[in-house]
């Protein structure tokens, strides 16, 4: 084993993967790989692969290795991690082969899902591997003292999962992980445009709509202007132009937002019950 370690932290996300070196974000790329169908070799990773989605090319297929916050395609995930590490800026590259990785995982991951993350990272070059639950990493990243006795609650809406956790003394006091998040919002928008405007749109277009006019409330003080969306009529394939408002998007996201609200309330309910038990045990002592 090498005497030196190249240390990197990876936020392995459903939508985007972030790599941190020496406390600095050095890569933030879409979690997408493009693979040549003939020999299964890697064509592109991240931003270079993302535009190839939904192109219908026969010789190249695009894969999102993670789904709902967990690895859905082991080989593609390994290729993505290797490809992203190879993309690190020269100042963060070295001749060292030994890599120490810290990787985020959803708090609701099963043992099998965690094993898949470990295997994928080790195949991608990790010699030392540490896993941290995503809400804990989010709290640390926000500068919260997770070791403090005062509790804090984190609600982290990612691409594949929404992570909810109450943290105190470096531990989860209560937590929830639901597979309703950014990708679900995108699918809601795709379904809405199909159903309401008879328009067929891609996932990247839905992502742009979400970012430009996405909202969880029907009334906003600083409301965004309507967004002009261009896409084919699903029946005739002729081009359509539709102005989409934030109120429309808020309406089509209502059910998913309600599921997140319910999950937050469940976590708060468990937190309150746990606090009552803790208080009772303290009184009993």
Features from the language model and the residues they span:
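Nucleotide/phosphate-binding catalytic cleft detector across ATP-hydrolyzing
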Residues: 1-157, 165-284
